[in-house]
Amino acid sequence: MAHLATVVLLLVAAARQAPLAAGDHSANPRLPTCAAAPDVAAPQEHGDGGGVGGGRRILDITHAVRAELPVLGSCDGVGALVRLKKSMANGSRSNLSELRMSVHTGTHVDAPGHMWQPHFDAGLDVDTLDLGLLNGPALLVDVPRHSNVTAEVMESLNIPRGVRRVLFRTMNTDKRLMWQKESDLSFVGFTEDGAQWLVGYTDIKLVGVDYLSVASYEHMIPAHVVFLKSKEIVIVEALKLDDVEPGMYMLHCLPLRLAGAEGSPVRCILIK
């Protein structure tokens, strides 16, 4: 507990500073520019929080799977993902839905093979991810606004050694980019040197971010490769960090056991 208190104090001292398939970061083609999205309030989602006893509270930081979720390279969102194949209203004995979507839709994890072919060939799929890294104490920090996560920014955050899981909240949350179906390539994320600084000078093994890519658009490939080539970093993208206070939490993220897949939708919660 003393260690967690120290981390929280350090955090307070730190400054606040044709369309691709969902999650397809394999190249950086010229993507369509969408019209400016209206400034609308985020729709209400069910199950955003609740008591778990003992004064603790569950915070759901997973975006609901909905047709309006953004996808890089599209102005129209991901579209309908769930289709009712059988309906009791039409005489079937049960209601039966079908789900079809990219494994990088909405809140999801990247496996090492996502952008490093040798790891894909070696079978380092989402089913090989370390659940121990996806569950445990995590630190939520605020990145200086209007800034990518560069090496300089990483150093300024003063994240203590020993912290293994960090969720980075950026201006993407302020701009409510995950609530807009239009792709917005002005999102911020890690630069290559920021990723290198994290790998070289911290003990962080889980990196969580608040938009579809851990890397900024300009650094899409190189920053991903820095993380994924190491095999030791787990990336969680498109987290819903609205209205969550900075500090220490217990993080629980569980991806699907998709054998052979380089990513998976994931349900992530924080317990305070």
Swiss-Prot record:
**A matching Pfam family:** Cyclase
Q: Which UniProt keywords apply?
A: Extracellular matrix, Secreted, Signal, Stress response
- Quick one: where is this thing mainly located? secreted
Matching InterPro entries, A to Z?
Answer: KFase/CYL (IPR007325), KFase_sf (IPR037175)
Q: Give a GO molecular function annotation for the protein.
A: arylformamidase activity
Q: Which GO terms describe its cellular component?
A: extracellular region
As for what it does, the entry says:
May be involved in response to stresses.
Q: Specify the protein name.
A: Cyclase-like protein 2
Q: Which organism is it from?
A: Oryza sativa subsp. japonica
What taxonomic ancestry is recorded?
Eukaryota, Viridiplantae, Streptophyta, Embryophyta, Tracheophyta
